[in-house]
Structure formats: C-alpha cells, structure tokens
C-alpha cells in the first residue's frame, strides 16, 4: 500500500500536538487551517513564535517573563514593593494581574529544589508581607513551611490566598480538600 502522507504537513501536525492540551485531531485542524485556509495568519504566528523565543527571558529579580533584565513589574516605581506574592509560574502572574487586585511585586518559585536561597533573600529585601499564591496541595504546603522557616528571622508577615468554593460551582462538584478549606476559612456575613 502506498503512503500518501505529506511529510511537511505531518511535521506541522506533530509540532502542534506537542503543545499542551492539543490532541491529534485539534493539531490536524490547526495545521490544515494554517497551510490551506489562512497562510498569512500562519506566517504571522510563526514570526511571533520566533520573536517570543528569541526575546523573552526571565526577569533577573523575580523570574517573571521579560524582554529586559528586569520585568515591567519589578521596574515599576509605583508598585508596592512591601508586598511580595510568591507564585509557581510566570503564568500565575498573568492571571493575578488580570484580576487587577494586587499592586505589589512577585517572585516565581516552581519547586523548592530549584530555589536559590541567596536570590530569595535578595528578592525579599524591604518586604513586609509575603503572600503565597499556590494551588492547594501537600507539596505546596510543604514549600510554604520551608520558605517561612528560611525567612523566619526577618520581620515579615506571611499570608496565603483564600481557597474554597468557586463561584457558580455546585457543592457536589467540589473536591473534599477545597470544601474543607472553605469551611475552615468561612467569613462572617
């Protein structure tokens, strides 16, 4: 039986399939759209990807995404540098910034084993409150305890974001850990 596959198309499908949350069928649809229906948009995407990979780096202070040595948040003199929000990923910074509720600065720590203690001490200079914005898990609770222990000699107030019942979700669809934390952190009305 003869193979009628087009190698360049298969390579494009494989490239799309390597992205998070993109399965084979979606990759085929994206590849087809790119090469057969909107070549200009595909070239624009290719250029944006190449530019992003070549230009975006980690901020030297907080590890956020940046085009310069310091990200736009660390270099903003109007941010409240007394409040430091520690997150697991630069993607988390994007999410928090979209909420418009936090005006402090950030620090990204993905795992304890990746943490540079000297760099962390540099990042917390002048900080009066550290807010941990981690998803709830035993691993993140352990990381919080570890960081608190390392910084205990400093006069810093430690908090973490509230966790509990999301808006619009039925109680039967909530995991037990989230429901337990919501009950523990209940507020007076």
Across the structure, where does each feature detected by a protein language model lie?
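Extended, structured, electrostatic nucleic-acid-contact surfaces
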Residues: 1-20
């Amino acid at each position: 039986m003869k193979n009628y596959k087009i190698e360049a198309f298969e390579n494009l499908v494989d490239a799309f399939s390597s992205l998070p949350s993109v399965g084979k069928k979606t990759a085929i649809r994206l590849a087809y759209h790119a090469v057969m229906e909107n070549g200009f948009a595909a070239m624009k995407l290719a250029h944006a990807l190449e530019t992003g990979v070549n230009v975006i780096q980690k901020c030297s202070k907080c590890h956020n995404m940046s085009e310069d040595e310091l990200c736009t948040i660390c270099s903003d003199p109007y941010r409240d540098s007394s409040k430091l929000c520690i997150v697991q990923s630069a993607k988390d910074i994007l999410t928090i910034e979209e909420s418009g509720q936090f005006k402090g600065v950030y620090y990204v720590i993905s795992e304890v084993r990746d943490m540079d203690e000297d760099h962390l001490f540099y990042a917390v200079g002048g900080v009066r409150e550290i807010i941990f914005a981690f998803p709830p898990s035993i691993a993140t609770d352990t990381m919080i305890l570890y960081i608190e222990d390392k910084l205990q000699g400093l006069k810093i107030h430690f908090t973490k974001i509230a966790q509990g019942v999301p808006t619009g979700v039925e109680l039967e669809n909530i995991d037990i850990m989230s429901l337990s934390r919501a009950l523990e952190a209940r507020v007076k009305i």
